[in-house]
């Protein structure tokens, strides 16, 4: 791994894009539509105040849908996972990689302007490859 690569470098390819989030009060079906529309596999979840309160990812939603397809009608806040952790902009590639696990599909980072971005496995793969 490149020791020089920092968390802030990992968002380079999508730093110009607005972070896509699901709202706690949205239906799971609406969140799934967002994921399909933007070709993303994980979503941070925010409350009415804009605070990050949870997360969704395709693996957990897949398992929930297999158990009960009616889950689509539930609210996001009823099925969401814990929020993705934040990393410092200067966190190393190795640090970020260790934080992304089976249970934790992504991490969040705030740039110098205060904008929040998501770092996923795909971002790490792109940095290494």
Predicted regions and their residues:
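Bateman (tandem CBS) regulatory domains
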Residues: 5-19, 74-83
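The conserved cystathionine-beta-synthase
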Residues: 21-39, 46, 65, 86-104, ...
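Short beta-to-alpha loop/turn elements within the nucleotide-binding domains of ABC transporters
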Residues: 26, 56, 74, 91, ...
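Short hydrophobic beta-strand motif reused across regulatory alpha/beta modules
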Residues: 41, 54-61, 117-124
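A cytosolic small-molecule/anion-sensing beta-strand core signal
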Residues: 47-48, 80, 111, 120
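Residue-level signal for well-ordered, solvent-exposed loop/turn and beta-edge residues enriched
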Residues: 51, 114-115
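A short, polar/charged loop-to-alpha-helix boundary motif
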Residues: 60-75, 124-129
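Mid-chain, well-packed structural core segment of small domains
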Residues: 70-94
């Amino acid at each position: 791994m490149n020791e020089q690569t920092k968390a802030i470098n990992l968002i380079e390819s999508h730093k110009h894009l607005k972070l896509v989030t699901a709202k706690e009060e949205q239906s799971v079906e609406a969140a799934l539509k967002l994921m399909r529309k933007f070709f993303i596999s994980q979503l941070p979840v925010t409350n009415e105040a804009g605070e990050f309160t949870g997360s969704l990812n395709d693996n957990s939603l897949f398992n929930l849908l297999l158990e009960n397809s009616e889950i689509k009608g539930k609210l996001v806040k009823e099925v969401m996972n814990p929020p993705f952790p934040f990393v410092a902009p200067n966190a190393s590639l190795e640090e970020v990689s260790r934080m992304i696990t089976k249970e934790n599909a992504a991490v969040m980072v705030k740039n110098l302007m205060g904008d929040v971005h998501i770092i996923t496995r795909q971002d790490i793969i792109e940095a290494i490859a």
